[in-house]
Amino acid sequence: MKKNAPYLFLSTCLISTYSFAEESWLNWQSNSISALYGKGFEVEPDTHETITFEHASNWKWGDLYLFVDTYWFDGEKTASQGHNAVYTELAPRFSISKLTNTNLSFGPVKDVLIATSFDLSIQDKAGYDDTWNYLVGPGFDLDIKGFDYFTLNFYYRIPDDGNTPSGQWQITPCWSYTVPFLKSSIIFDGYIDWVVNSKGNNSSDFHFNPQIKYDLSPHLGLSPKKLAAGIEYDYWKNKFLIEDTPYFKTNQNATSFIVKYTF
């Protein structure tokens, strides 16, 4: 039962999303599938082949973001993850202005939210447990000129591995910026996860993960931003909260080619 729990959790989340949508709580939603091939990864094997499913939606109570990354290690394997791994985050945010029918905007802040996230790493190796992290804190929607969106969340991290103490703080900005180019556009989007302090055996870390993609849609008769291709850069200092040393390198500089289809 424990082995099936992560998949049951994800299935329940997706089914619940569409059930609520039928009740007209949903304002809009977007789903996408991305395929990536990259090199330069640390801690895990150097080469990653990745399929990513993403869901973003806006509701009468707030918003929701979900992604599922499935990795293959090009024939190699890790001690804990085997030949592949799955990592997912489910991040609902609850809008205080929507829930209280109060305008909380000020300056560049459009809305104030209660931000939460449930992070799960699924191990493909006997004898290793799946790992969970729970995050909660204040979130903000920002109105910054030129950006399609810009969010800023502050999280208190609560690990659920039985060994790591709570007490680490994480700052997470997410953004998207579109620039017209060659009768189409270039999309610059991404996020930063910055765990600002150490706790127990866990180091601080800094994860910068932007994508630059060219929108192919207008050239194929598709709606804007349906199909895009480009490059993802992945800089991760002290990856997995493991401090980089001369004997075990955890500072990562990886680059991947990406093709993304949105539906």
Question: What spans do the regions from the language model cover?
Answer:
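Membrane-embedded beta-strands of outer-membrane beta-barrel proteins
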Residues: 53, 90, 136-138, 173-175, ...
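Short glycine/proline- and aromatic-enriched beta-strand/turn motifs that initiate or cap beta-hairpins
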Residues: 22-71
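N-terminal signal peptide c-region/cleavage motif recognized by signal peptidases
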Residues: 16-19
